[in-house]
Amino acid sequence: MTELARLKFYATQPHSCSYLPDEQATTLFLDPSQPMDVHVYADLSEMGFRRSGDHLYRPHCQNCNACVPARIPAVRFIPNRQQRRILKRNADLTVSAVRPVFKEEYFDLYRRYIEQRHADGDMYPPSRDQFSTFLVRDLPFCWFYEFRLEGRLMAVAVCDLLPNGLSAVYTFYEPDEERRSLGRYAILWQITEALRQNLDAVYLGYWIKNCKKMNYKTQYRPIELLINQRWVTLN
């Protein structure tokens, strides 16, 4: 483990929770003056931290522990029947790893995805500045994985390639292609990619039991949840 004791962290004031409307949230951030070192990031991911833009953070709420870090142990994952169908349905897609840059093609897909799938969320309305600040960061471990069908952009999975796994930062996809289940396929592809690169896990962020938008995460089994500072397997 990196010597984390030397790092500084800052907690926000309580603010409205993005996931549970009746709750107040507090967020713990790594000191933004700390360089974004991939090994520090990997160690913090083991402790439940995530990246958003240039910041590493985790929930630090006094009266709530509903946000549970989740990861998929890649080597032990076995797709179920529905997931095998999703893999087969999207076998015609090609995937390319590219550096994170702003393109109107990306933003147009992101905009339509947010407008049609997350118009009730805190990322609505989408803007170019928001998209760039959130996803287009010049970090050596960050990659855009493009999913294309005969040249047409269908999805982009934004991932961080860490020594201990792939961290799934965000995925946006063609909202009119509901039958393909592109969001689920992107996770399945990332599990396969983690195996190909001999990585331990795919980090999915936070699972919240009472948030319907998070329910999909526990459909990947086995999954590991960080409970009382220990990763616990849910089969």
From Swiss-Prot:
Gene name of the encoded protein: bpt
Alphabetized SUPFAM superfamilies for the sequence: Acyl-CoA N-acyltransferases (Nat)
Protein known as: Aspartate/glutamate leucyltransferase
Protein's cellular compartments: Cytoplasm
Enzyme Commission no: 2.3.2.29
GO MF terms, alphabetically ordered: arginyl-tRNA--protein transferase activity; leucyl-tRNA--protein transferase activity
Pfam families per UniProt: ATE_C (PF04377), ATE_N (PF04376)
Database matches in InterPro entries: Acyl_CoA_acyltransferase (IPR016181), Asp_Glu_LeuTrfase (IPR017138), N-end_Aminoacyl_Trfase (IPR030700), N-end_Aminoacyl_Trfase_C (IPR007472), N-end_Aminoacyl_Trfase_N (IPR007471)
Domain of life where this protein originates: Bacteria
One GO biological process term: ubiquitin-dependent protein catabolic process via the N-end rule pathway
Organism listed in the record: Pseudomonas entomophila (strain L48)
Catalytic reaction list: N-terminal L-glutamyl-[protein] + L-leucyl-tRNA(Leu) = N-terminal L-leucyl-L-glutamyl-[protein] + tRNA(Leu) + H(+); N-terminal L-aspartyl-[protein] + L-leucyl-tRNA(Leu) = N-terminal L-leucyl-L-aspartyl-[protein] + tRNA(Leu) + H(+)
Segments crossing the lipid bilayer: none
Record-stated family: Belongs to the R-transferase family. Bpt subfamily.
Keyword Cytoplasm: yes
Protein function: Functions in the N-end rule pathway of protein degradation where it conjugates Leu from its aminoacyl-tRNA to the N-termini of proteins containing an N-terminal aspartate or glutamate.
Keywords: Acyltransferase, Cytoplasm, Transferase
GO annotations of cellular component type: cytoplasm
